[in-house]
Each structure stands twice: as C-alpha cells, then as structure tokens.
Design a protein with these regions (language model features):
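A cross-family "folded-core" feature that marks the main globular domain of proteins
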Residues: 2-114
Length: 114
C-alpha cells in the first residue's frame, strides 16, 4: 500500500534519518515507512505524528526474494531509500502511474552498486 498524505496519525517506531521514519499506523497497528522532508527531525520513538501532503508512505508488510520490507528498510542506508524515492517521484511526473513497490529493490540495488 502506498498513499500520499492521508492525514492519519502514526506513532514513531524508529527514526532512520531526518527524512525517513518507520511509523505504526494508528488504525491498523501495522508498520509503514514514511518519507518526507524533515519528518524525522527531532522526533523520538513513540512520538505521534501526522502524514503531510507530499509525504510518501510505504507498507512494510510485503516480502520479496530479498526478505521482508521491514528488514530491507532497516538494512538499507536511508540515503538510498531517499534517492530511490526521488527517482520514483520523477518517473511519476513523466509516466503518471508507476508501481512504487519497486522502492526497496531499487534502493537495495543502488546501495549495492555504489
């Protein structure tokens, strides 16, 4: 599941960097990767926050041949997650509709290639 700015409350599970956190959704108690400018800045574990317009939310429930999404999200350096997200943002501008489920494999590939 990927949503943009759904205005639902989350609770911080882990701060990956200033722009990336793992949050627990208030309604379904599932973990999501939330990316947005400064979203993790000054945040502490268990602090509540709201997704803003422009933030991107990725489900951490999916699994692939490289592992589950949460393991990938915490093992990949956050800068590569941000770069992959920016690439997907630009691709979305050109192609309108893209599959954002490629974020984790793309970030993993970028980290390995560099």
């Amino acid at each position: 599941m990927v949503t943009h700015g759904d205005k639902i409350m989350y609770r911080i599970s882990k701060v990956l960097n200033h722009n990336t956190v793992i949050g627990i959704h208030a309604d379904d108690n599932q973990e999501y990767l939330v990316m947005g400018k400064g979203i993790g800045f000054g945040k502490k574990v268990s602090e509540r926050f709201e997704v803003r317009d422009g933030d991107t939310v990725y489900s951490l429930q999916a699994t692939s041949n490289r592992g589950n999404a949460k393991e990938l999200a915490t093992s990949i350096q956050p800068i590569y997650l941000e770069i992959a997200n920016e690439i997907l943002d630009e691709a979305e501008k050109v192609f309108q509709n893209i599959d954002r489920a490629v974020l984790f494999p793309m970030a993993d590939h970028l980290e390995y290639a560099v």
